[in-house]
Swiss-Prot record:
The keyword Cell membrane applies. GO terms for cellular component: plasma membrane. Residues 44-74, 90-119 form the 4Fe-4S ferredoxin-type domain. Disulfide bonds: none annotated. NDH-1 shuttles electrons from NADH, via FMN and iron-sulfur (Fe-S) centers, to quinones in the respiratory chain. The immediate electron acceptor for the enzyme in this species is believed to be ubiquinone. Couples the redox reaction to proton translocation (for every two electrons transferred, four hydrogen ions are translocated across the cytoplasmic membrane), and thus conserves the redox energy in a proton gradient. Keywords: 4Fe-4S, Cell membrane, Iron, Iron-sulfur, Membrane, Metal-binding, NAD, Quinone, Repeat, Translocase, Ubiquinone. It is a peripheral membrane protein. InterPro entries: 4Fe4S_Fe-S-bd (IPR017896), 4Fe4S_Fe_S_CS (IPR017900), NADH_quinone_OxRdtase_chainI (IPR010226). The gene is nuoI1. This is NADH-quinone oxidoreductase subunit I 1. It is found in: Cell membrane.
Amino acid sequence: MNGVAAIAKGMATTLKVLFRKPVTVDYPYVKRPRAPRFRGRHELRTYENGLEMCVGCELCQVACPAAAITVQAAENDPDNPHSPGERYGYKYQVDLLRCIFCGMCEEACPTDCLHLTQEFELADFTRESLILQKEQLVNRNPSGFKVPMNVYPPFRRKAVNA
């Protein structure tokens, strides 16, 4: 009698789940929404006037627990500036093979130039293409970033309603 009850219980569970809406989606044609705080591909932001927000402080490199970020700073040329500061990120490299997408680099950035986007489709055929150089990271189409008044404007983090 004990075995019959177990089979009946299992069949009841099967029938209950059978008529539910399926959890799977027809990806890539139908995409599920991501969480608002999802962290994906890295992006370096620029100001509206084209200057890079990165001042080459290397704090993102220091904060990265996986050592996935490499930054080399160079002195800024006053005649042809790259950023509003004295220095700029001459070489900026993110190794997506090492990155754990924790967001510590984003939090460490004093100018708020480093941003983790919602982009998550990062698969590729070669390992070299997953090491992103500065040219691949810089977003030349800024939206809402004003011309800097000074090198380190007082950025404030907004609280996210959880």
